[in-house]
């Protein structure tokens, strides 16, 4: 197994999002990827079959050529396994991995210090790489392309730049916002992998694997109930599984049945669609208070007692993706699916909108 060095990697995200059970960001001190649940080889990584096939070919070719692989960019929503894949790459290559994050790199010198300490073949994993300072990005361009960093010696007019040659290494960058990466930085990655949300079937397999690791005896159908509520995101699935495990321990359950899953997660106000209290409050406001919409973002946020940014960035992406809401030039509109989920008969003109 590869050696891991952590240079201030941080778990960041909106404060409001980090308090939700269905958040794709880590909650509190929750690790980005639990060591006990993390697979260490590509064959043990569940889901993302096309990406795995591409990555396997990429790594096999590097091993046969006996050179470190090209730099890798992992892009996709939070909680889908980007950090886990970075660890797997290092394990597959049997090399150490250094871990840092964009927010942890305050100055270009911080990054230069890390780069200058790398050995041949090492992996440098930069989480949230889109949040690197501009000066650090520019330093990284040269390091990734030419395997050198320019060290400034002296100050003022007499300052000079001395090139420091670096051993060949591999950068793995992870980002939830690929569009924020400057084109010169994106161009230096030889392989870009896009992670997608998981279908229920793959999430069920992941939940069953995690349950075995955690010692949770799930009855037939229990993994399915968990998958329905996990928003296509492994991090959420594992978090909800832990809460169900707590329920089973407190209630002395030997086998966790589907009804136990429903009851345990109902305690946290998580329904069968993965919607929580805030999601339901938003839908209720649109449907009950604004007759289905359209309603402006500020009015909607005021109705549910949240900041506009919270509603827009925390709630809306999932509600839109799952077809409960649409954004129109006039405002937010609840779909027929939203009315039905709330148990309210849609008004006559709702179905005509879609």
Swiss-Prot record:
DNA binds at residues 327, 332. Residues 4-198 are annotated as: Large ATPase domain (RuvB-L). Its EC number is 3.6.4.-. Residues 272-354 are annotated as: Head domain (RuvB-H). Residues 199-269 are annotated as: Small ATPAse domain (RuvB-S). Pfam families: AAA_lid_4 (PF17864), RuvB_C (PF05491), RuvB_N (PF05496). SMART domains: AAA. GO terms for cellular component: cytoplasm; Holliday junction resolvase complex. One of its GO terms (molecular function) is four-way junction DNA binding. It catalyses: ATP + H2O = ADP + phosphate + H(+). Keywords: ATP-binding, Cytoplasm, DNA damage, DNA recombination, DNA repair, DNA-binding, Hydrolase, Nucleotide-binding. It is an enzyme of class 3 (hydrolase). It comes from the Bacteria. Belongs to the RuvB family. Has 3 domains, the large (RuvB-L) and small ATPase (RuvB-S) domains and the C-terminal head (RuvB-H) domain. The head domain binds DNA, while the ATPase domains jointly bind ATP, ADP or are empty depending on the state of the subunit in the translocation cycle. During a single DNA translocation step the structure of each domain remains the same, but their relative positions change. The RuvA-RuvB-RuvC complex processes Holliday junction (HJ) DNA during genetic recombination and DNA repair, while the RuvA-RuvB complex plays an important role in the rescue of blocked DNA replication forks via replication fork reversal (RFR). RuvA specifically binds to HJ cruciform DNA, conferring on it an open structure. The RuvB hexamer acts as an ATP-dependent pump, pulling dsDNA into and through the RuvAB complex. RuvB forms 2 homohexamers on either side of HJ DNA bound by 1 or 2 RuvA tetramers; 4 subunits per hexamer contact DNA at a time. Homohexamer. Forms an RuvA(8)-RuvB(12)-Holliday junction (HJ) complex. HJ DNA is sandwiched between 2 RuvA tetramers; dsDNA enters through RuvA and exits via RuvB. An RuvB hexamer assembles on each DNA strand where it exits the tetramer. Each RuvB hexamer is contacted by two RuvA subunits (via domain III) on 2 adjacent RuvB subunits; this complex drives branch migration. In the full resolvosome a probable DNA-RuvA(4)-RuvB(12)-RuvC(2) complex forms which resolves the HJ. This is Holliday junction branch migration complex subunit RuvB. It comes from Bifidobacterium longum (strain NCC 2705).
């Amino acid at each position: 197994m590869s050696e891991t060095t952590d240079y201030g990697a941080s778990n960041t995200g909106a404060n409001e999002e980090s308090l939700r059970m269905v958040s794709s960001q880590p909650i509190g001190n929750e690790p980005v990827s639990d060591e006990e649940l993390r697979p260490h080889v590509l064959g043990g990584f569940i889901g993302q079959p096309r990406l795995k096939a591409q990555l396997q070919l990429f790594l096999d070719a590097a091993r046969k050529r006996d050179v470190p692989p090209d730099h890798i960019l992992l892009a996709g929503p939070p909680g889908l396994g980007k950090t886990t894949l970075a660890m797997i790459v290092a394990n597959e290559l049997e090399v150490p991995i250094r871990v840092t994050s964009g927010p942890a790199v305050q100055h270009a010198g911080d990054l230069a210090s890390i780069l200058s300490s790398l050995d041949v073949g090492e992996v440098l994993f930069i989480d949230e790489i889109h949040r690197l300072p501009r000066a650090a990005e520019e330093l990284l361009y040269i390091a990734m392309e030419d395997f050198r960093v320019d060290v400034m010696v002296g100050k003022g007019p007499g300052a000079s730049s001395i090139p420091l040659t670096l051993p060949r290494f591999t950068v793995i960058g992870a980002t939830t916002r690929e569009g924020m990466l400057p084109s010169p930085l994106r161009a230096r990655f030889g392989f870009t992998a896009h992670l997608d949300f998981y279908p229920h079937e793959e999430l069920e397999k992941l939940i069953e694997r995690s349950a075995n690791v955690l010692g949770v005896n799930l009855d037939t159908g229990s993994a399915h109930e968990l998958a329905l509520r996990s928003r296509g995101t492994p991090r959420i699935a594992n978090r909800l599984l832990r809460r169900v495990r707590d329920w089973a321990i407190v209630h002395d359950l030997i086998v966790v049945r589907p009804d136990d899953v429903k009851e345990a997660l109902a305690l946290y106000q998580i329904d069968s669609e993965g919607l929580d209290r805030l999601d339901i409050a938003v839908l209720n406001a649109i449907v009950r208070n604004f007759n289905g919409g359209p309603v402006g973002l500020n009015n909607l946020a005021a109705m549910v007692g949240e900041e506009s940014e919270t509603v827009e960035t925390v709630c809306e992406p999932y509600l839109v993706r799952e077809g409960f809401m649409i954004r129109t030039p006039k405002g937010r509109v609840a779909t027929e699916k939203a009315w039905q989920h709330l148990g309210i008969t849609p008004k006559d003109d709702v179905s005509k909108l879609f």
